[in-house]
Amino acid sequence: MLRIAVAAALAAAAVSAHAQMTEEVARQAAQELRMLVTEGTGVIGDLQPAINGSKTTKEQVSPDALVNAFRARYQKAAGNAFDPKATGIVGDARRAYVQSFTSVVTRYQGNLNKGGQDAFVPAFFRAQVLKDFNQLMSGKVQAYATNRDAELINGDWAVHKVMKGSPLAGEVKTLMETGSLEPVVKRSGNTVMGYYPMKLAPACVSCHAQNGLKQTEGGFGGAFVAEIPVK
């Protein structure tokens, strides 16, 4: 039912897909995007031991169960229940994110059910969700997850690829080179940028080590970037 409601709401919002917003609203939207992506990706992160050990159950990884897990994580982090009926850009982003999340976990049911080491890792999941999300929110909001070239497990997630054509690509690359863990939310020309560094969790360090990448827990692990056109 939620998926049907989300699809209907997105269709109704399509007429405003290219409307620009104020800087203040864009900053709020950037924060919301950070919350959505962090908590959504965390759902798959929580399941990594079960996925890697081929110990998931069909009920545990069904699309509905995973969406419910996302809603629970969101509520715990935000302090408020997830409301997909919210108005404005925040509501549009929530609906697009849930639709993208649901679409991806539905497409990859085989991986989630069969499992195995690295069968469905959080970074891959996040990349697929953002790809779908960006298509739904074209002209309104774009979201990216990327890292420094020397620390990429997958070259497809390099800045020059995921942010191709973005006015923020050069600035993001420069910020990442500093390795700073401080977020940056600012206006750059006609765009508000939400730049949010990601810290490496123990599971990430362990997984990356298997690919020959030596990293430190709590260190810089790439960045999530929100790009929002403004008036």
Which role fits each region the language model picked out?
Residues 1-6:
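Bacterial N-terminal signal peptides that target proteins for export
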Residues 14-16:
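N-terminal signal peptide c-region/cleavage motif recognized by signal peptidases
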Residues 19-199, 213-231:
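Extracytoplasmic c-type cytochrome modules immediately beyond a signal peptide or single-pass transmembrane anchor
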Residues 200-212:
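The canonical Cys-X-X-Cys-His
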